[in-house]
Amino acid sequence: MAISKVWISLLLALAVVLSAPAARAEEAAAAEEAAAPEAVLTLHADNFDDAIGQHPFILVEFYAPWCGHCKSLAPEYEKAAQLLSKHDPAIVLAKVDANDEKNKPLAGKYEVQGFPTLKIFRNGGKSIQEYKGPREAEGIVEYLKKQVGPASKEIKAPEDATYLEDGKIHIVGVFTEFSGPEFTNFLEVAEKLRSYYDFGHTVHANHLPRGDAAVERPVVRLFKPFDELVVDSKDFDVSALEKFIDASSTPKVVIFDKNPDNHPYLLKFFQSNAPKAMLFLNFSTGPFESFKSAYYGAVEEFSGKDVKFLIGDIESSQGAFQYFGLKVDQAPLILIQDGDSKKFLKEHVEAGQIVAWLKDYFDGKLTPFRKSEPIPEANNEPVKVVVADNVHDVVFKSGKNVLIEFYAPWCGHCKKLAPILDEAAATLQSEEDVVIAKMDATENDVPGEFDVQGYPTLYFVTPSGKKVSYEGGRTADEIVDYIRKNKETAGQAAAATEKAAEPAATEPLKDEL
């Protein structure tokens, strides 16, 4: 299970003291910028397709007027649009109010799950990619300039390959000629992954700074600043090539410390859906070397397993401790989060126990643990408190229509929403088939049925199990109106449940080959 974007940000933010923000622009420049006409195109349902068709490359932000992150992005987005309007060719930035009723079909079509969502449209919308770049103007500009050019650049001379030694990950295809299925597949993968890596291609392996110059071609060569430094693959199947790049571009053991050079690998580690094994201990104490040796040995022993490994310093990993519900006095500890969001913990682990404990995990012998606050003894407020240990009972098994908020205590938007939810819940208190609930997502594991990428996140769940991300208004009246319009009665819930069960009851048995 991948960790939500907001938590990944916190994990990394707590690992290093962030530098002070850049100096502000002078007032005269700011005034001049404010007076300039808006460079960001405003799109809506009536002009969206035409705009996408007119521009070979366009970045579109799907936003909501009430979204705090959208408001923070707006001036940076506009500044980037103004700077990129001078680029040759011009790079276009646009925005869509996805909260507007007439634009909601667009949000649905392009799978907008939260705000802001940014997508790159190429070639009239034939290619659509998530924007994975920075959120400040200068970063947006540099990122998009790279995205506009070819996905892979030809290396014609040794001087063209000097960038391969810059300490980043690069992928180079070595071919006898720039044609054929292998080259086509390579370019397809380069286009798909260009947001993450730099790609190059050449017919001269001897131009490259590392690797066998006499290698049989075609071959894909990945350069990296860790482990083997260079690794080759001859499998040009698109799926196999993507897997090769994914597996080779992360260290065998990701290090969680204050070194910012490790943060890109941490980001990729926590975004991965693969099972994750994490050893947390104090890097500055004597036993560290023996633990490190034992852990790296275990990584080699289980190298054939589908699991990613991390070793983290306690001091740098407080965000991870908070996310996983761990305590410093449990260290040294080893934790596994599997692809189904289950977690397995061994606290006070000894170096000599690591291999055996991992073997027990792979053999299915371990019992999962879950982060949960205690179930409230009294729960008499209009908005009901739910925790990980009772969320399924309250939300999915109560037979009621439930609006549930996932929040963080430190979140300003959550604090503003709290009295509004209280008011809405009080208004609906006499309607016994309705519950408004809240869960502190920093103290409880969020069930896998919900995708929580930021705070607050709200879902509406009906008695029949229908689950919808709530993207409606943020006033008490709007929330009440939404619930009353969308709730199921007992009869509707029974009918929906019966209808959902019909295919399973009538579908003939099939033999699976």
UniProtKB/Swiss-Prot annotation:
Role, per record: Participates in the folding of proteins containing disulfide bonds, may be involved in glycosylation, prolyl hydroxylation and triglyceride transfer.
Site (Lowers pKa of C-terminal Cys of second active site): R474
Disulfide topology: C67-C70, C411-C414
Range of residues in the leader sequence: 1-25
A single GO cellular-component term on record: endoplasmic reticulum lumen
Protein name per the record: Protein disulfide-isomerase
Top-rank taxon, per record: Eukaryota
Location in the cell: Endoplasmic reticulum lumen
Low complexity bias: start-end ranges: 491-507
Alphabetic keyword roster: Disulfide bond, Endoplasmic reticulum, Glycoprotein, Isomerase, Redox-active center, Repeat, Signal
Biological-process GO terms, alphabetical: protein folding; response to endoplasmic reticulum stress
EC number: 5.3.4.1
Glycan-modified residues: N282
Species for this entry: Hordeum vulgare (Barley)
EC supergroup of this enzyme: isomerase
